[in-house]
């Protein structure tokens, strides 16, 4: 039976019920709905709606229902209830009779679902923070394991300057630390309790909403009933945070897919995160990484979906807002599995150091060092840049690295070049000079790694 049937003289059509019911999606809120109902029973007891014994009976029945359903979603879905709130109330009435009909006194499904959703976001958000921390730890472990492996750094997907692999790992540590900070901030803003604000104008009962909020683990109650039941900022913000984090995951996946390609051959991926081809027996495909990259799109889609749903809604609750959950649940599921999979990929990754070093020595990645050498000799940088560009053109024509040009050939571009030029053109010199804070010199990377390991 629907919770709102008294106003209507005929049953809803089967098509409308199928269209309107949200239980196949919001059954996931069972724990939060029951926990919120337990708190509400205590709150209405304190204002005289229930006796202490009635409150105890409701608490017992609600806890019993939670034990029956927490690991049995099919039991919930098979009930045919309109939504998770209807399921809980109908199940409660079946257990305690008319006493169950008292529980909804002073409460609306509007503040109820807002409370459920915030409780769910808080719980799942904490789990996501743990997964982000695990991925951060996996990157730090990989950075330590492959710290000094020399590889080319890229701009425009062209070899630019040499870096060490540990520096690459720590770049992504920075990104995922920002993701952690963003999610922490979002959860802090979500830590206000909607319960007790009613349908839109507040409850008619003199609730201690501060006490109610604390009983549910919130920092404080919300302060405006109209805003409270209209608000889905926490859903949007978490989906936004997930989208940014998935972008970071996708970029990391793209790097690793390229590093693993036959054209690069910089890394080997473990068999447990790759698959083969049904036709080509030689193939070992980076499917885990490609799926991370692919799932990023569906997370973006969910963010755009909730933004579009909310963009023109008048205050307060509108049924459009029922569409907030499916996308949110999918975002959190996708984000979670991608974080877990990324950590697994990193745990078995091996760097082919000979190939990365060989690649770092190609592509004239030491050109900037030659320009800096000329600057040290007193030449203005812009002029040095031009001179080195001419030297690179000459080296390309001769199909030789810069460091293999003779001194006479180099001096043809500038008379200030001397025999000491070759010292600055080595890979070791290129790396060692990047010693300012944040650079890729080995001492700097070791120092940065130590900071991350200690925090």
Curated annotation (Swiss-Prot):
InterPro entries xrefs: Arg_succ_lyase_C, Argininosuccinate_lyase, Fumarase/histidase_N, Fumarate_lyase_CS, Fumarate_lyase_fam, Fumarate_lyase_N, L-Aspartase-like
Protein name: Argininosuccinate lyase
CDD domains (alphabetical): Argininosuccinate_lyase (cd01359)
Listed GO CC annotations: cytosol
GO BP term, pick one: L-arginine biosynthetic process
Lyase as UniProt keyword: yes
GO molecular function annotations of the record: argininosuccinate lyase activity
SUPFAM superfamilies for the chain: L-aspartase-like
Major subcellular location class: cytoplasm
Pathway of action: Amino-acid biosynthesis; L-arginine biosynthesis; L-arginine from L-ornithine and carbamoyl phosphate: step 3/3
Cell compartment(s), UniProt: Cytoplasm
Family: Belongs to the lyase 1 family. Argininosuccinate lyase subfamily.
Stretches that traverse the bilayer: none
Keyword annotations from UniProtKB, A to Z: Amino-acid biosynthesis, Arginine biosynthesis, Cytoplasm, Lyase
EC number of this enzyme: 4.3.2.1
Highest rank taxon of the organism: Bacteria
Catalytic reaction annotation: 2-(N(omega)-L-arginino)succinate = fumarate + L-arginine
Translocase listed as a keyword: no
């Amino acid at each position: 039976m629907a919770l709102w049937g008294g106003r209507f003289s005929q049953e809803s059509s089967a098509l409308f019920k199928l269209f309107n019911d949200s239980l196949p999606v919001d059954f996931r809120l069972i724990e939060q709905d029951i926990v919120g109902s337990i708190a509400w029973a205590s709150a209405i007891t304190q204002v005289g709606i229930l006796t202490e014994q009635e409150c105890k009976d409701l608490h017992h029945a609600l806890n019993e229902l939670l034990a029956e359903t927490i690991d049995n979603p099919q039991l919930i879905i098979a009930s045919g209830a309109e939504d998770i709130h209807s399921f809980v109330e109908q199940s409660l009435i079946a257990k305690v009779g008319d006493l169950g009909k008292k529980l909804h006194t002073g409460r609306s499904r509007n503040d109820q679902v807002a409370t459920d959703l915030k409780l769910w976001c808080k719980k799942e958000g904490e789990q996501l923070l743990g997964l982000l921390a695990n991925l951060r730890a996996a990157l730090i472990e990989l950075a330590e394991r492959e710290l000094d492996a020399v590889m080319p750094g890229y701009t425009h997907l062209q070899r630019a300057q040499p870096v060490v692999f540990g520096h690459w790992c720590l770049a992504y540590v920075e990104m995922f630390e920002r993701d952690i900070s963003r999610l922490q901030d979002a959860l802090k803003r979500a830590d206000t309790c909607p319960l007790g604000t009613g349908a839109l104008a507040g409850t008619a009962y003199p609730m201690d909403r501060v006490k109610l909020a604390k009983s549910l683990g919130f920092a404080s109650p919300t302060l405006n009933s109209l805003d409270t039941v209209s608000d889905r900022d926490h859903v949007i913000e978490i989906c936004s945070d997930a989208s940014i984090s998935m972008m970071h995951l996708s970029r990391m996946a793209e790097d690793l897919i390229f590093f693993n390609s036959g054209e690069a051959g910089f890394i080997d991926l473990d068999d447990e995160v790759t698959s083969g081809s049904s036709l080509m027996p030689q193939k070992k495909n980076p499917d885990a990484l490609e799926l991370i990259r692919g799932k990023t799109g569906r997370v973006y889609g969910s963010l755009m979906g909730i933004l579009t749903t909310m963009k023109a809604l008048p205050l307060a609750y509108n049924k459009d807002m029922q569409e907030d959950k499916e996308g949110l649940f999918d975002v959190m599921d996708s984000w979670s599995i991608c974080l877990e999979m990324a950590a697994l990929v990193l745990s078995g990754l091996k760097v082919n150091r000979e190939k990365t070093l060989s690649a770092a020595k190609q592509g004239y990645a030491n050109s900037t060092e030659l320009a800096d050498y000329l600057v040290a000799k007193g030449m203005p940088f812009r002029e040095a840049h031009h001179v080195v560009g001419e030297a690179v053109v000459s080296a390309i024509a001769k199909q030789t690295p810069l460091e293999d040009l003779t001194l006479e050939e180099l001096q043809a571009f500038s008379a200030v070049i001397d025999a000491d030029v070759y010292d600055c053109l080595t890979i070791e010199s290129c790396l060692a000079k990047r010693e300012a804070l944040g650079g890729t010199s080995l001492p700097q990377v070791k120092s940065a790694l130590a900071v991350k390991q200690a925090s």
